Amino acid sequence: MPTFETPTAIILTVDVPMGYVEIAATDRNDTVVEVTPSNPKRSGDVQLASEATVIFTDNTVAVRVPKKLSLFGPGDSVGVRIALPTGSAVTVDAAYATVRTTGELGESRVTSAYGAVTLQHTASLTLNSAHGEVDVHRVAGDLDATTGHGRLRVDRVDGEARIKGSYGDIGLGEVGGVIDARTSGGISVDRAGSDVSIRSAHGAIQVREVSGGTVRLENANARVQVGVPAGMAAWVDAASQHAAVRNELTAEPGPRADDRTVELRLRNNYGDIIIHRAI
Protein backbone atom coordinates (compact mmCIF):
# COMPACT_ATOMS: atom_id res chain seq x y z
CA MET A 1 0.00 0.00 0.00
CA PRO A 2 2.03 3.00 -1.26
CA THR A 3 2.14 5.99 1.11
CA PHE A 4 3.63 9.36 0.15
CA GLU A 5 4.38 12.42 2.26
CA THR A 6 2.16 15.19 0.87
CA PRO A 7 1.85 18.07 3.35
CA THR A 8 -0.12 20.14 0.83
CA ALA A 9 -2.81 19.42 -1.74
CA ILE A 10 -1.66 17.23 -4.62
CA ILE A 11 -2.62 16.44 -8.20
CA LEU A 12 -4.11 12.98 -8.62
CA THR A 13 -4.76 11.08 -11.86
CA VAL A 14 -6.52 7.72 -11.90
CA ASP A 15 -7.07 5.47 -14.92
CA VAL A 16 -9.17 2.36 -14.23
CA PRO A 17 -10.73 0.16 -16.93
CA MET A 18 -13.07 -1.85 -14.69
CA GLY A 19 -13.97 -1.89 -11.01
CA TYR A 20 -14.44 0.99 -8.60
CA VAL A 21 -12.64 4.14 -7.44
CA GLU A 22 -13.04 5.62 -3.96
CA ILE A 23 -11.29 8.90 -3.07
CA ALA A 24 -11.41 10.43 0.41
CA ALA A 25 -10.11 13.96 1.00
CA THR A 26 -9.34 14.95 4.60
CA ASP A 27 -6.97 17.24 6.49
CA ARG A 28 -3.88 15.04 6.34
CA ASN A 29 -0.20 15.28 5.37
CA ASP A 30 0.15 12.12 3.33
CA THR A 31 -1.46 10.24 0.44
CA VAL A 32 -2.28 6.55 0.65
CA VAL A 33 -3.12 4.41 -2.39
CA GLU A 34 -4.55 0.90 -2.26
CA VAL A 35 -5.26 -1.24 -5.33
CA THR A 36 -6.94 -4.57 -4.64
CA PRO A 37 -8.66 -7.25 -6.74
CA SER A 38 -12.43 -6.85 -6.80
CA ASN A 39 -12.66 -10.59 -6.18
CA PRO A 40 -9.58 -11.95 -4.35
CA LYS A 41 -10.52 -15.48 -5.45
CA ARG A 42 -10.48 -14.61 -9.15
CA SER A 43 -7.05 -14.99 -10.71
CA GLY A 44 -7.65 -12.35 -13.37
CA ASP A 45 -8.54 -9.72 -10.79
CA VAL A 46 -5.52 -10.62 -8.68
CA GLN A 47 -3.22 -10.41 -11.70
CA LEU A 48 -4.64 -7.07 -12.82
CA ALA A 49 -4.19 -5.55 -9.35
CA SER A 50 -0.57 -6.67 -9.30
CA GLU A 51 0.06 -4.92 -12.63
CA ALA A 52 -1.26 -1.54 -11.47
CA THR A 53 1.33 1.24 -11.23
CA VAL A 54 1.45 4.05 -8.69
CA ILE A 55 3.94 6.85 -9.39
CA PHE A 56 4.64 9.95 -7.30
CA THR A 57 6.57 12.83 -8.83
CA ASP A 58 6.39 16.65 -8.70
CA ASN A 59 3.49 16.57 -6.23
CA THR A 60 1.50 14.37 -8.62
CA VAL A 61 0.27 10.86 -7.86
CA ALA A 62 -0.60 8.81 -10.94
CA VAL A 63 -2.50 5.54 -10.57
CA ARG A 64 -2.82 3.46 -13.71
CA VAL A 65 -4.44 0.08 -14.16
CA PRO A 66 -3.69 -1.51 -17.56
CA LYS A 67 -6.52 -2.15 -19.97
CA LYS A 68 -7.11 -5.77 -20.94
CA LEU A 69 -9.45 -7.04 -23.64
CA SER A 70 -11.78 -9.83 -22.53
CA LEU A 71 -13.41 -11.75 -25.37
CA PHE A 72 -15.21 -14.26 -23.15
CA GLY A 73 -16.82 -13.66 -19.77
CA PRO A 74 -16.50 -10.66 -17.47
CA GLY A 75 -13.36 -8.58 -17.63
CA ASP A 76 -10.78 -8.35 -14.88
CA SER A 77 -11.67 -5.85 -12.18
CA VAL A 78 -9.94 -3.96 -9.36
CA GLY A 79 -10.79 -1.59 -6.57
CA VAL A 80 -8.82 1.62 -6.06
CA ARG A 81 -8.97 3.44 -2.71
CA ILE A 82 -7.11 6.70 -2.20
CA ALA A 83 -6.84 8.96 0.85
CA LEU A 84 -5.36 12.40 0.14
CA PRO A 85 -5.20 15.99 1.45
CA THR A 86 -8.17 18.34 1.25
CA GLY A 87 -8.19 20.54 -1.86
CA SER A 88 -6.32 18.09 -4.10
CA ALA A 89 -7.01 18.29 -7.83
CA VAL A 90 -8.37 15.04 -9.25
CA THR A 91 -8.70 13.53 -12.72
CA VAL A 92 -10.44 10.16 -13.04
CA ASP A 93 -10.87 8.17 -16.25
CA ALA A 94 -13.07 5.14 -15.63
CA ALA A 95 -14.34 2.85 -18.37
CA TYR A 96 -16.58 0.34 -16.56
CA ALA A 97 -16.36 1.51 -12.97
CA THR A 98 -18.16 3.32 -10.20
CA VAL A 99 -16.57 6.50 -8.85
CA ARG A 100 -17.16 7.90 -5.38
CA THR A 101 -15.48 10.81 -3.60
CA THR A 102 -15.87 12.25 -0.11
CA GLY A 103 -14.47 15.44 1.37
CA GLU A 104 -13.48 18.63 -0.41
CA LEU A 105 -11.53 18.25 -3.65
CA GLY A 106 -9.94 20.92 -5.83
CA GLU A 107 -10.49 21.22 -9.57
CA SER A 108 -11.82 17.86 -10.75
CA ARG A 109 -12.35 16.02 -14.02
CA VAL A 110 -14.31 12.78 -14.13
CA THR A 111 -14.90 10.68 -17.24
CA SER A 112 -17.05 7.57 -16.93
CA ALA A 113 -18.24 5.34 -19.77
CA TYR A 114 -20.39 2.97 -17.69
CA GLY A 115 -21.03 3.31 -13.98
CA ALA A 116 -22.44 5.49 -11.23
CA VAL A 117 -20.61 8.63 -10.12
CA THR A 118 -21.07 10.15 -6.64
CA LEU A 119 -19.11 13.28 -5.71
CA GLN A 120 -19.42 15.15 -2.42
CA HIS A 121 -17.56 18.43 -2.98
CA THR A 122 -15.32 19.77 -5.74
CA ALA A 123 -14.01 23.12 -6.89
CA SER A 124 -14.73 23.47 -10.62
CA LEU A 125 -15.93 20.20 -12.15
CA THR A 126 -15.71 18.83 -15.69
CA LEU A 127 -17.87 15.74 -16.01
CA ASN A 128 -18.44 13.34 -18.89
CA SER A 129 -20.77 10.42 -18.16
CA ALA A 130 -22.04 8.20 -20.97
CA HIS A 131 -24.09 5.59 -19.08
CA GLY A 132 -24.87 5.81 -15.38
CA GLU A 133 -26.44 7.95 -12.70
CA VAL A 134 -24.51 10.94 -11.35
CA ASP A 135 -25.00 12.60 -7.96
CA VAL A 136 -22.99 15.67 -6.93
CA HIS A 137 -23.54 17.49 -3.66
CA ARG A 138 -21.62 20.71 -4.30
CA VAL A 139 -19.51 22.30 -7.03
CA ALA A 140 -17.76 25.33 -5.52
CA GLY A 141 -16.77 26.64 -8.98
CA ASP A 142 -18.12 26.17 -12.50
CA LEU A 143 -19.76 22.98 -13.75
CA ASP A 144 -19.23 21.63 -17.28
CA ALA A 145 -21.18 18.40 -17.72
CA THR A 146 -21.90 16.12 -20.66
CA THR A 147 -24.26 13.22 -20.00
CA GLY A 148 -25.69 10.42 -22.10
CA HIS A 149 -28.02 7.79 -20.66
CA GLY A 150 -28.58 8.38 -16.97
CA ARG A 151 -29.84 10.85 -14.42
CA LEU A 152 -27.75 13.83 -13.29
CA ARG A 153 -28.41 15.54 -9.94
CA VAL A 154 -26.30 18.43 -8.61
CA ASP A 155 -27.45 19.96 -5.33
CA ARG A 156 -25.46 23.19 -5.54
CA VAL A 157 -23.27 25.01 -8.07
CA ASP A 158 -21.61 28.21 -6.86
CA GLY A 159 -20.51 29.28 -10.35
CA GLU A 160 -21.88 28.73 -13.84
CA ALA A 161 -23.50 25.50 -15.04
CA ARG A 162 -23.00 24.40 -18.65
CA ILE A 163 -24.71 21.10 -19.44
CA LYS A 164 -25.22 18.98 -22.53
CA GLY A 165 -27.51 16.01 -21.98
CA SER A 166 -28.95 13.28 -24.15
CA TYR A 167 -31.64 11.06 -22.64
CA GLY A 168 -31.44 11.28 -18.85
CA ASP A 169 -33.22 13.77 -16.64
CA ILE A 170 -31.20 16.63 -15.11
CA GLY A 171 -31.85 18.09 -11.69
CA LEU A 172 -30.07 21.17 -10.35
CA GLY A 173 -30.51 22.62 -6.89
CA GLU A 174 -29.22 26.16 -6.37
CA VAL A 175 -27.01 27.62 -9.12
CA GLY A 176 -25.26 30.92 -8.44
CA GLY A 177 -24.09 31.72 -11.97
CA VAL A 178 -25.41 31.51 -15.51
CA ILE A 179 -27.17 28.29 -16.55
CA ASP A 180 -26.79 27.06 -20.14
CA ALA A 181 -28.33 23.61 -20.70
CA ARG A 182 -29.29 21.55 -23.75
CA THR A 183 -30.93 18.14 -23.39
CA SER A 184 -33.49 15.74 -24.80
CA GLY A 185 -34.79 14.82 -21.35
CA GLY A 186 -36.35 16.73 -18.53
CA ILE A 187 -34.55 19.39 -16.52
CA SER A 188 -35.42 21.09 -13.26
CA VAL A 189 -33.74 23.92 -11.34
CA ASP A 190 -34.64 24.75 -7.75
CA ARG A 191 -33.18 28.26 -7.75
CA ALA A 192 -31.38 30.14 -10.53
CA GLY A 193 -29.14 32.96 -9.35
CA SER A 194 -28.47 34.54 -12.75
CA ASP A 195 -29.39 34.28 -16.44
CA VAL A 196 -30.87 31.01 -17.66
CA SER A 197 -30.92 29.40 -21.11
CA ILE A 198 -32.46 25.92 -21.29
CA ARG A 199 -33.60 23.95 -24.31
CA SER A 200 -35.19 20.49 -24.29
CA ALA A 201 -36.54 18.30 -27.07
CA HIS A 202 -38.84 15.97 -25.13
CA GLY A 203 -38.65 16.51 -21.37
CA ALA A 204 -40.37 19.00 -19.10
CA ILE A 205 -38.52 22.17 -18.05
CA GLN A 206 -39.08 23.61 -14.59
CA VAL A 207 -37.30 26.53 -12.92
CA ARG A 208 -38.86 26.82 -9.48
CA GLU A 209 -37.39 30.21 -8.63
CA VAL A 210 -35.56 32.80 -10.71
CA SER A 211 -33.51 35.70 -9.33
CA GLY A 212 -33.55 38.14 -12.23
CA GLY A 213 -31.75 38.67 -15.50
CA THR A 214 -32.95 36.94 -18.67
CA VAL A 215 -34.57 33.51 -18.60
CA ARG A 216 -34.92 31.70 -21.93
CA LEU A 217 -36.74 28.36 -21.87
CA GLU A 218 -37.51 26.45 -25.08
CA ASN A 219 -39.25 23.10 -25.43
CA ALA A 220 -40.76 20.98 -28.15
CA ASN A 221 -43.07 18.44 -26.55
CA ALA A 222 -43.42 18.97 -22.80
CA ARG A 223 -44.36 21.54 -20.18
CA VAL A 224 -42.39 24.69 -19.41
CA GLN A 225 -42.84 26.04 -15.89
CA VAL A 226 -41.17 28.97 -14.14
CA GLY A 227 -41.59 30.60 -10.73
CA VAL A 228 -41.07 34.32 -10.07
CA PRO A 229 -40.51 35.46 -6.46
CA ALA A 230 -43.02 37.76 -4.80
CA GLY A 231 -42.10 41.39 -5.26
CA MET A 232 -40.17 40.80 -8.48
CA ALA A 233 -41.45 42.40 -11.67
CA ALA A 234 -41.48 40.21 -14.79
CA TRP A 235 -41.38 41.12 -18.47
CA VAL A 236 -43.07 38.19 -20.23
CA ASP A 237 -42.77 37.02 -23.83
CA ALA A 238 -44.37 33.55 -23.96
CA ALA A 239 -45.89 31.53 -26.79
CA SER A 240 -46.88 27.89 -27.40
CA GLN A 241 -47.92 26.85 -30.91
CA HIS A 242 -50.25 23.97 -30.00
CA ALA A 243 -50.89 24.31 -26.26
CA ALA A 244 -51.82 26.81 -23.58
CA VAL A 245 -49.95 29.67 -21.93
CA ARG A 246 -51.03 30.30 -18.34
CA ASN A 247 -49.67 33.41 -16.67
CA GLU A 248 -50.66 33.47 -13.00
CA LEU A 249 -48.82 36.71 -12.27
CA THR A 250 -51.08 39.70 -11.65
CA ALA A 251 -50.68 42.76 -13.84
CA GLU A 252 -49.04 45.63 -11.97
CA PRO A 253 -47.66 49.11 -12.80
CA GLY A 254 -44.16 49.24 -14.27
CA PRO A 255 -41.28 48.61 -11.85
CA ARG A 256 -39.38 51.36 -10.09
CA ALA A 257 -35.70 51.82 -10.84
CA ASP A 258 -34.66 49.90 -7.73
CA ASP A 259 -37.12 47.00 -8.17
CA ARG A 260 -35.87 43.52 -8.97
CA THR A 261 -36.86 42.46 -12.48
CA VAL A 262 -36.68 39.38 -14.69
CA GLU A 263 -37.15 38.97 -18.42
CA LEU A 264 -38.95 35.75 -19.39
CA ARG A 265 -38.69 34.50 -22.97
CA LEU A 266 -40.57 31.21 -23.18
CA ARG A 267 -41.31 29.07 -26.23
CA ASN A 268 -43.03 25.73 -26.74
CA ASN A 269 -44.54 23.66 -29.53
CA TYR A 270 -46.83 21.01 -28.02
CA GLY A 271 -46.53 21.67 -24.30
CA ASP A 272 -48.10 24.16 -21.91
CA ILE A 273 -46.28 27.17 -20.49
CA ILE A 274 -47.02 28.06 -16.86
CA ILE A 275 -45.76 31.19 -15.09
CA HIS A 276 -46.45 31.53 -11.37
CA ARG A 277 -45.15 33.01 -8.15
CA ALA A 278 -42.35 31.00 -6.59
CA ILE A 279 -43.42 29.01 -3.56
Residue ranges and their predicted role:
Residues 1-279:
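Intrinsically disordered, low-complexity terminal regions
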